[in-house]
Amino acid sequence: MPELGSLLLSTQAVAAPGELLNLALHAGTVGPEAAVLVAMIATLLVDLAGEKVSVRWVPPICYAGLGSALVLLALQWNAPLEPSFLGAFLSDHLAIAFRAVVALSTLLSLLISWRYAEQSGTPVGEYAAILLAATLGGMLLCGATDLVSVFVSLETLSVASYLLSGYMKRDARSSEAALKYLLVGSAAAAVFLYGASLLYGLSGSTSLEVIGNALVTSPTPLAALALVFVLATVAFKIAAVPFHQWTPDVYEGSPTPVVAFLSVGSKAAGFALALRLLVGCFGSFDTQWKLLFTVLAILSMTLGNVVALAQTSMKRMLAYSSIGQAGFVMIGLVCGTEDGFAAMVLYMATYLFMNLGAFACIILFSIRTGSDRISDYAGLYQKDPLITLGLSLCLLSLGGIPPMLGFFGKIYLFFAGWADHQYVLVVVGLVTSVISIYYYIGVIKMMVVKEPQEASEVVKAYPPINWSTMGLPPLRVALVLCVLVTAVGGILSNPLFEWASSTVAGTPLLQQAIATSSGASLG
């Protein structure tokens, strides 16, 4: 992307001195993040007025902030590409798409959070403010193009995630989850800093573009060591095997709405980071990191889906499922082709709705029964057809059953992998998809097939449904929206893939990598 740096310099050369700072910053680029920041500050101020005021005003403030962020992101889609903050942030199409996924995942997570927070006695204002802080870090991470901005945004996301994981202070499992997450996350941050220091020493710059150019001209063993450290950090963030050990315990112990955000928003930011660092910095080590990611993808798909078979907790099952889903997304990353990158973007967008829809059903069941055990879902169809239908459709979509949206997301990934001769990845993906269908359908069978007399004791004591209870209408909106998109979105798979392809086309970083890869293949 040499044209980006020259764009900034040439623009500055013709500007008046008083305008140089504004031209160098291009602060309007981070307008969506500013909207989230204003909403976060407003929730903290409202929280000072007491819990009653918070319960009334915090939700609309969050909706306004996140809604404004999504609108501003849409307006940026066809805007001229300008590096901002002295080249530390770039709002290309890749950044816009992944920032939208992060913001939308937060919005849906908040919709399914209010009733859960009220029932558990969680202060609404503090919870929303910390979740918005995590969102801010995730969105900035998606567009960060400098080691300093990468680290600051990564730690903003991470520290807020630690706080969210341990937010249920009276729950020993939540505290344990937060401690494990903190220890492993701190180690990952230290590893990243060491890798970043090596990159700075090799290039004399913190700019990812400059670092990438320096590594092309003089690849060294130290650069390979830096690649290992950076790859370990990325693998931790996306919960890829063998850096996944924290995931099941954190998912099981954390508040369920927090898990919903971590499974989508945090993972999306992690994949955006992977693209920025691996494709942007380590183009000269393309063969090496793709080989490593091939191994990680195979391990993640295999272990995630096989271990999920033995789980008795719904959240632990979805934790291992998310590890397997990360393996599927890595197929697109390893391909490095236009179709591969587009399929990767598309699958993250589809994963947003089908996974959050599943978590909305789990939260609703937990609110009414206090249970997370899979066996307690037996016979649920007799008592709550809405949860049964919603959870069934979302699980079928996660398994890749046609005509659900998840089927088209996976099929595009497999097509891209096959076209790029990644036959082993595609075969492993197909086999592990079949395995995942087995445990997803096992849950559906338990809910639907069981006779009334075979229903679990929890379902037999299922309370009457009252949707007018405070906090339940937003949850119902999120549930219905996710289920509808998951079930009907398959009809729109071609327009969605065209949108994902335009995301790749509007990202100079990916276009340069595709051109380089094509040139090497022809050579």
Swiss-Prot record:
Keywords: Membrane, NAD, NADP, Plastoquinone, Quinone, Thylakoid, Translocase, Transmembrane, Transmembrane helix, Transport. It comes from the Bacteria. The chain crosses the membrane at residues 30-50, 57-77, 94-114, 128-148, 182-202, 223-243, 255-275, 291-311, 317-337, 345-365, 389-409, 424-444, 477-497. It is a multi-pass membrane protein. HAMAP family: NDH1_NuoN_1. Its EC number is 7.1.1.-. This is NAD(P)H-quinone oxidoreductase subunit 2.
